[in-house]
Amino acid sequence: VKLSKRWSTSLLAHYENETKAHDSNDDGFADIPRVEQYNLWNRWAYMGDRYVFQAGIKVLTEDRNSGQVSHGKTSLADPYKISIGTDRYEAFTKNAYIFNKEKNTNLALILSGSLHKQDALYGRKIYDVDQHNAYASLLFETELTKRQSLSAGLSFNYDSYDQHYRLDNDAAQPLTKKFTKEAVPGAYVQYTYNWDDKLVLMGGIRGDHSSEYGYFVTPRFHVKYNPNEYVHFRLSAGKGYRTNHVLAENNYLLASS
């Protein structure tokens, strides 16, 4: 919705309710999960002559259930159930100031944060997690010549995971508690050469420091060559790092035996 010459906003909402169990093959297990989900997304934008601003929030609430189902009036004494409850909240803001429109010289600041809470039950196995994330990025871009451009930036990423879990079916076993956190500040610089969109060369390097793993450097190089509008060649080289969170990323495997 355009509120004025410079301000606009949008609001999206979604509701899903699939709460009836289906067992078409009569194997005693639900064919698809029963899901009730709420989604809300709101964004605001300001477009000035030199200043650009965006901000938004996202909210997700979901209950997902599956497992054994009973047919008719017969009830199961101890059915196998899967239950996953999720609450997620996100917020972001993007700010950019244009110093020189002809050379596309600008400075941008991006901030975002999220809270993710999940309570999952797989039979007697349990995996509950609270994740907090904060991210900040400061970027500078400019065109050196008609065919050359340079970008550089600083970034900071923070993650924390508060996990409570039981990985076997013994309900008498206490929950294991594990808390991890990682802070990663970093910086990068990137050079781009563009010859009439036929040949594009891009080279960059960034350095980061992880509070868990120390310093590391990640270079990268990209080449794109377009001899005509139908043929395109691409070549990329580089390396990257990421921190694995095995249970958070693969807890769905707890549903298997």
What is each of the regions a protein language model found here?
Residues 18-39, 47-107, 113-131:
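Flexible loop and strand-edge segments within Gram-negative outer membrane beta-barrel domains
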Residues 6-25, 37, 102-121, 149-159, 167, 211-217, 225, 229-257, ...:
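Surface-exposed extracellular loop regions of Gram-negative outer-membrane beta-barrel proteins
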Residues 1, 36-42, 87-93, 132-138, ...:
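Hydrophobic, lipid-facing positions within transmembrane beta-strands of outer-membrane proteins
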Residues 2-7, 46-50, 97-103, 142-146, ...:
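Outer-membrane beta-barrel strand-turn architecture
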Residues 97-110, 169-170, 177-178, 248, ...:
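Surface-exposed loop/interface segments of Gram-negative outer-membrane beta-barrel transport/assembly proteins
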